[in-house]
């Protein structure tokens, strides 16, 4: 027995399937052809260009913020290196003073071996006291490159005004990026005010990024120079401490022999 009624037509299912197929997908941005289609396409293109310009301006703004944050961290690290240099220099001065005092003690020990002659030698060869540098305020002197980089970063606003390419380009008309349009800015940027503002903001951000990255590079080079100089101080200090340790051992041996 057939599972379908006698009046059933199997080809009717194919017709129903074709009717049930989804309509082709169409983007809402697709514009129909017609008398106003070219103008609509131009308007859509303008909106797309403006959207991309705004996204680019926002991206350069975020990059600028990251650059400023990196520069701030670089300045903090550089200033910490300067304080560390001050500590190393004070330590070196103290080691020098200890070595001088130890030499004086050794002379006293040698003079004790001869009672009378020792007294004469003591008063005659007493070394002149040198002013103690660590008692005063010792101002650390960082490397010239690092000092210049720190000062440059702290004066970044004045430096930016002096080195901004757009300001030099537009100084004859006294215009600034994002300000009133001049003859130069009208030629350099689009006529659409919103698009022109985006382009000016992008140019301003890129120019400031260029100057800021230059400052950041100077900070990095200054930090490297400062680290190299502090390595020299550490090597010098290590040698002095080793020499002082030998002198202390020798002095202790002489004291026990008295």
UniProtKB/Swiss-Prot annotation:
Role summary: SNAREs, soluble N-ethylmaleimide-sensitive factor-attachment protein receptors, are essential proteins for fusion of cellular membranes. SNAREs localized on opposing membranes assemble to form a trans-SNARE complex, an extended, parallel four alpha-helical bundle that drives membrane fusion. SNAP29 is a SNARE involved in autophagy through the direct control of autophagosome membrane fusion with the lysososome membrane. Also plays a role in ciliogenesis by regulating membrane fusions.
All residue ranges annotated as the t-SNARE coiled-coil homology domain in the record: 196-258
Compartmental location: Cytoplasm; Golgi apparatus membrane; Cytoplasmic vesicle, Autophagosome membrane; Cell projection, Cilium membrane
Subunit structure: Forms a SNARE complex, composed of VAMP8, SNAP29 and STX17, involved in fusion of autophagosome with lysosome. Interacts with multiple syntaxins including STX6. Interacts with EIPR1. Interacts with STX17; this interaction is increased in the absence of TMEM39A.
Gene Ontology cellular-component annotations: autophagosome; autophagosome membrane; centrosome; ciliary pocket membrane; cytoplasmic vesicle; cytosol; Golgi membrane; plasma membrane
Gene Ontology molecular function: any one: syntaxin binding
Keyword Cytoplasm: yes
Family: Belongs to the SNAP-25 family.
Name this polypeptide is given: Synaptosomal-associated protein 29
Gene that encodes the chain: SNAP29
Family annotation (PROSITE patterns): T_SNARE
Example GO biological process: exocytosis
Listed Polar residues bias regions: 131-142
Principal place of residence: cytoplasm
Location of Phosphothreonine modifications: 130, 137
Sites bearing Phosphoserine, chain numbering: 65, 77, 114, 163, 182, 185, 204, 210
Spans annotated as Disordered: 1-43, 127-147, 161-188
Entry membrane topology: Peripheral membrane protein
Presence of the UniProt keyword Phosphoprotein in the record: yes
Coiled-coil positions: 76-107
Organism (species): Bos taurus
Keyword terms: Autophagy, Cell membrane, Cell projection, Cilium, Cilium biogenesis/degradation, Coiled coil, Cytoplasm, Cytoplasmic vesicle, Golgi apparatus, Membrane, Phosphoprotein, Protein transport, Transport
């Amino acid at each position: 027995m057939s599972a379908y009624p006698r009046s059933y037509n199997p080809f009717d299912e194919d017709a129903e399937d074709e009717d049930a197929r989804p309509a082709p997908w169409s983007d809402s941005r697709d514009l129909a052809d017609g008398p106003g289609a070219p103008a609509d396409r131009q308007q859509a293109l303008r909106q797309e260009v403006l959207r991309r310009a705004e996204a680019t301006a926002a991206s350069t703004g975020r990059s600028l913020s990251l650059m400023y944050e990196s520069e701030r961290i670089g300045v903090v690290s550089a200033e910490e290196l300067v304080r560390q240099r001050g500590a190393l220099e004070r330590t070196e001065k103290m080691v020098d003073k200890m070595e001088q005092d130890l030499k004086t003690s050794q002379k006293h020990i040698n003079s004790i071996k001869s009672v009378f002659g020792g007294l004469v030698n003591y008063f005659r060869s007493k070394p002149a006291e040198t002013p103690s540098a660590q008692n005063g305020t010792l101002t650390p002197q960082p490397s010239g490159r690092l000092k210049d980089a720190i000062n440059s970063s702290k004066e970044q606003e004045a430096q930016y005004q002096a080195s901004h390419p757009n300001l030099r380009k537009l100084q004859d008309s006294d215009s600034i990026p994002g300000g009133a349009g001049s003859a130069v800015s009208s030629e350099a940027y689009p006529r659409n005010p919103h698009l022109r503002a985006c382009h000016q903001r992008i140019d301003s951000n890129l120019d400031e990024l260029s100057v800021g990255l230059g400052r950041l590079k100077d900070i990095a080079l200054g930090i490297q120079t400062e680290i190299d100089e502090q390595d020299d101080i550490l090597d010098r200090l290590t040698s002095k401490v080793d020499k002082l340790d030998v002198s202390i051992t020798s002095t202790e041996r002489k004291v026990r022999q008295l």
